[in-house]
């Protein structure tokens, strides 16, 4: 169970139609008949039916379905029209802001009819739409593209032809289909994926300057190492040492730290990937000091043109792997000219958070540790068992599980209210939610989803080595990381880390030494929350990752690391040559064929399940797993390459023997399988979790929670409550029961719930002001009727409840950790009221080192991952002198250096600028509050 924040201003309502919405009258009649026959069969099965009757019904269903398919095939050349009855609220979904959304000038408040998502059930209808377009309300729509996620779920995007023609140059940076075809065409599915980049959820990069960018060749070397080489024709597996070509910057570029202190993914026309902060200006200056005979600022772009990085004030360096359609432009100057001419824009997505919370491991990563003992498994389950035991009795655990603590950077209004007013835990809605979350956690834990000491981090290559390659011309640079070292500041005290990545099919546990302490000077160059990998390591082949934004689960759990070291002692990377993707002319037929290839040949879930069967067996066939891993990657690339190796008969038999039977018992929890679909519980690692994960009875303990007063949620506690108000509450409860569930992905095209929330809020605000409606619902649902389910209420009106709490709660108060009484704090670190204070042992103030900037500071909370107050407050935007005993800041207004601080909250402005700011604020306050008389 996941609690989701609804951001109305970032979501745009559009229609999502399945292919039945485009049927002709004749096709619709057959479809209705087919649905009726299926309903009759279902009723007959429930009431009892003889085999001949069942066979007759099935035959009629098959005949009707075949007639429908034949009719659809006959209408391939038809320009279809959306049926009027399909234009209903249940077919409205929300999509996130993107470059495409911005160029189409869509609005978040009303239905946008310029873009439509099509869900494919019958390929014949999809073929007709892709080749011929369709009409809705007199407007013609044409096929646009489909993202990778949409392809997996058999969806694509269609756009109003007139609107698309108006913004197509802005989306493609002036590269028409005709010009691509003149250059020999392109791989169709790659083209669709690159075109769909503009449909990725992004925020506008407002100060992006294309003139400060260049594109250069990728950093590539040959890394020698031992591999298991697989011949894709014979399936022979040979262990040998060989040189493996690796593109270390595959999808990764650099950005100066003055523009961004954080890693993030970029989207621009034909450009995608990760941008990682690295001060290449400083690298060039130091290289010039080492070798004054050469100006190291010169670099050659992918078109052979030389650039002086400093004189041209280059701030962003893209790599060839990031610029997907580079070969169709004669120079980067042409791209830049078009970029400005057509007012193209860039977007940011997946920006690295300042604080990365601990993550959970999954069953794929556990099932490969086949030698794990019961004691080791129990140690790994300890954190999960502790959370389960405290979820109904410990206030801190309750708030953390509900996402109502400081670690959650993306709270919904329910979570914000709960963090501000923990007494709300006494409400029945919170109790039911906790009970459901406890049950969900138990199921997840038995499915292998366990709380561990691990975090998801961006994978970044050694960018210092990349600069040695680019600016110093060293073919095989040493870099800052040697051998198989990694570096991350998030685990400064961990000497070893287990670097993992999904999907995890073979034994991809890359246990690596963390050099944070051993090489302290590295933080002069590496200063993000990512994990940096050595360019002398085959880790990218072990984990099968690119550096275009892929993330790794970096685990510091000592038990997992020790088991992984033991288990993977003789494991080397798998290596096999992949097929190349062929180019083709872009035509409507080619676009449709490409979509069909992607829809019909991308089922990697079946192979994943087969591998799980092998790992759950008593004697896992690891060679069979290696072969299945290879086949899995060929299936992933099939839509682009249209190539899949043919399995030799001996291997076909061996794999069928290894994967024969039902799926493991834990699939009952991991995939929702029934008892008859799974094997009996075995001795596999994940199966043993059934007995290792502790199940506790839910006994809610309200001892330290305090008294809940519903009136705190109200703007005016004295509002009248009569027949009118009762009708409002009754109507809200009735409509809320039909809204659906909010527990879907915010990136899912099927999120009807959020449109329902928006429409419901709009409807009820017709009955009165926001404060009035909120107060009526609070009194009716919290006091008059004690409604147990209030998710829809908080999603609709949680913003006003939160504002009411801010106004009603006494300032500078908090709940006592021991008795739950709300008290006025006299110290920011005070957690206990006066009655309980003697029992509170104040912690000693100690010196800690900030993991972000290296500055020394005073704190009561000395732990790995400590962050100084300056970095917490200003996000390191103006921090300097990292590693010194004093933390030096610059004024955010004039840039003057500020005084160093030792303890407490630092200022961000010098006294002069702060004085000016104070006078300006006083003037604004006087204007705002002056008398009207």
Identify the function of each model-found stretch.
Residues 915:
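Flexible, glycine- and charge-enriched loops at secondary-structure boundaries
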């Amino acid at each position: 169970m996941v609690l989701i924040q609804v951001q109305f201003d970032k979501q745009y309502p559009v229609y999502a139609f399945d292919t039945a919405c485009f049927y002709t009258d004749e096709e619709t009649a057959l479809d209705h008949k087919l649905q009726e026959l299926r309903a009759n069969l279902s009723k007959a099965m429930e009431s009892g039916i003889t085999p001949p009757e069942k066979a007759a019904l099935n035959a009629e269903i098959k005949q009707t379905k075949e007639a429908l398919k034949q009719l659809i095939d006959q209408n391939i050349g038809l320009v279809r029209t959306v049926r009027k009855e399909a234009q209903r609220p249940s077919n409205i979904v929300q999509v996130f802001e993107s470059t495409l959304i911005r160029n189409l000038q869509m609005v978040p408040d009303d239905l946008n009819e310029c873009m439509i998502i099509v869900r494919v059930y019958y390929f014949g209808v999809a073929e007709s739409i892709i080749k011929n377009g369709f009409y809705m309300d007199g407007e013609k729509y044409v096929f646009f593209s489909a993202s990778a996620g949409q392809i997996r779920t058999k969806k694509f995007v269609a756009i109003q032809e007139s609107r698309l023609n108006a913004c197509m140059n802005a989306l493609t940076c002036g590269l028409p289909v005709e010009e691509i075809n003149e250059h020999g065409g392109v791989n169709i599915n790659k083209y669709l994926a690159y075109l769909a980049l503009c449909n990725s959820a992004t925020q506008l990069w407002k100060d992006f300057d294309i003139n400060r960018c260049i594109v250069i060749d990728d950093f590539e070397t040959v890394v020698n190492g031992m591999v298991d080489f697989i011949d894709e024709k014979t399936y022979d597996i040979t262990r040998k040492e060989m040189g493996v070509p690796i593109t270390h910057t595959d999808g990764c570029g650099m950005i100066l730290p003055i523009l961004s202190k954080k890693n993030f993914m970029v989207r621009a026309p034909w450009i995608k990937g990760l941008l990682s902060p690295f001060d290449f200006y400083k690298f060039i200056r130091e290289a010039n000091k080492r070798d004054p005979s050469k100006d190291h600022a010169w670099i050659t772009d992918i078109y052979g043109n030389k650039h002086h990085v400093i004189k041209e004030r280059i701030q962003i360096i893209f790599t060839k792997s990031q610029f997907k359609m580079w070969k169709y432009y004669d120079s980067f100057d042409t791209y830049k000219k078009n970029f400005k001419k057509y007012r193209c824009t860039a977007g940011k997505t997946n920006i690295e958070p300042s604080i990365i919370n601990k993550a959970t491991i999954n069953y794929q990563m556990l099932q490969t540790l086949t030698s794990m003992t019961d004691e080791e498994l129990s140690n790994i389950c300890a954190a999960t068992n502790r959370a389960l035991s405290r979820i109904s009795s410990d206030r801190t655990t309750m708030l953390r599980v509900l996402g109502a603590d400081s670690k959650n950077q993306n709270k919904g209004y329910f979570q914000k209210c709960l963090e501000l007013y923990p007494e709300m835990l006494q409400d029945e809605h919170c109790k039911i939610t906790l009970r459901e979350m406890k049950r969900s956690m138990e199921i997840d834990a038995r499915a292998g989803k366990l709380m561990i000491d691990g975090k998801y981090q961006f994978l970044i290559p050694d960018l210092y080595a990349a600069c040695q390659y680019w600016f110093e011309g060293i073919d095989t640079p040493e870099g800052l990381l040697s051998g198989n070292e990694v570096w991350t500041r998030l685990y400064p005290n961990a000497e070893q880390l287990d670097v993992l990545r999904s999907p995890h099919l073979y034994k991809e546990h890359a246990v690596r030494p963390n050099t944070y302490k051993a090489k302290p000077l590295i933080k002069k160059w590496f200063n993000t929350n990512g994990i940096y990998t050595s360019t002398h390591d085959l880790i990218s082949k072990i984990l099968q990752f690119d550096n275009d934004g892929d993330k790794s689960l970096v685990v510091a759990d000592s038990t997992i690391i020790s088991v992984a070291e033991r288990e993977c002692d003789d494991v080397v990377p798998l290596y096999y040559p992949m097929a190349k993707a062929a180019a083709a002319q872009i035509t409507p037929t080619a676009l449709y064929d490409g979509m069909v290839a992607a829809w019909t040949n991308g089922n990697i879930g079946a192979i994943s399940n087969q591998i799980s069967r092998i790992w759950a067996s008593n004697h896992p066939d690891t060679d069979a797993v290696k072969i299945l891993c290879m086949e899995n990657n060929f299936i992933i690339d099939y839509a682009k390459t249209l190539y899949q190796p043919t399995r030799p008969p001996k291997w076909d038999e061996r794999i069928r023997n290894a994967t024969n039977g039902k799926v493991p018992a834990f699939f009952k929890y991991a995939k929702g399988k029934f008892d008859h679909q799974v094997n009996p519980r075995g001795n596999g690692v994940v199966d043993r979790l059934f007995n290792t994960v502790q199940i506790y009875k839910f006994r809610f303990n309200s001892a330290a929670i305090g008294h809940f007063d519903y009136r705190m949620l109200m703007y005016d506690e004295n509002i009248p409550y009569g027949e009118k108000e009762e009708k409002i509450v009754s109507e809200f409860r009735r409509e809320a029961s039909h809204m659906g569930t909010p527990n879907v992905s915010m990136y899912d095209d099927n999120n009807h719930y959020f449109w329902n929330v928006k429409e419901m809020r709009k409807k009820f605000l017709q009955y009165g002001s926001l404060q009035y409606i909120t107060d009526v619902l609070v009194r009716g649902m919290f006091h008059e009727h004690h409604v147990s389910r209030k998710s829809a209420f908080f999603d609709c009106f949680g913003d006003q409840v939160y504002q009411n709490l801010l106004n009603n709660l006494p300032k500078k108060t908090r709940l006592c950790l021991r008795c739950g009484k709300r008290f006025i704090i006299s110290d920011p670190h005070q957690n206990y009221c006066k009655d309980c204070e003697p029992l509170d042992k104040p912690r000693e103030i100690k010196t800690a080192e900030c993991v972000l900037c290296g500055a020394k500071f005073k704190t009561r909370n000395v732990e790995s991952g400590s962050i100084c107050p300056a970095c917490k407050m200003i996000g390191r935007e103006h921090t300097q002198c990292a590693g010194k005993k004093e933390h030096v800041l610059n004024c955010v207004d004039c840039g003057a250096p500020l005084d160093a601080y030792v303890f407490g909250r630092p200022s961000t402005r010098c006294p002069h600028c702060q004085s000016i700011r104070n006078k300006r604020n006083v003037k604004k306050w006087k204007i705002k509050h002056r008398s009207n008389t």
